[in-house]
Amino acid sequence: MRVMINQVEYLLPEGAKLEHALEALQAQHPFAVAINLQFIPKSNYGQCALAENDQIEIISPVTGG
């Protein structure tokens, strides 16, 4: 299935979970994730099934002064 992650198209197997997509991308903590503009708590990554055309945003914190 096709999903967009940070505006880049990826093909994932049907039934893929968010946790597997993050592992495949080697995402480094800390970060937050939103799917279709909906924040997903870290505790739900393993249960969150992805669907065709999902828009996933991986957001890393920015520090500054």
Tell where the protein language model's regions lie, with residue ranges.
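Ubiquitin-like/PB1-type beta-grasp interaction modules and other compact soluble beta-rich domains
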Residues: 1-64
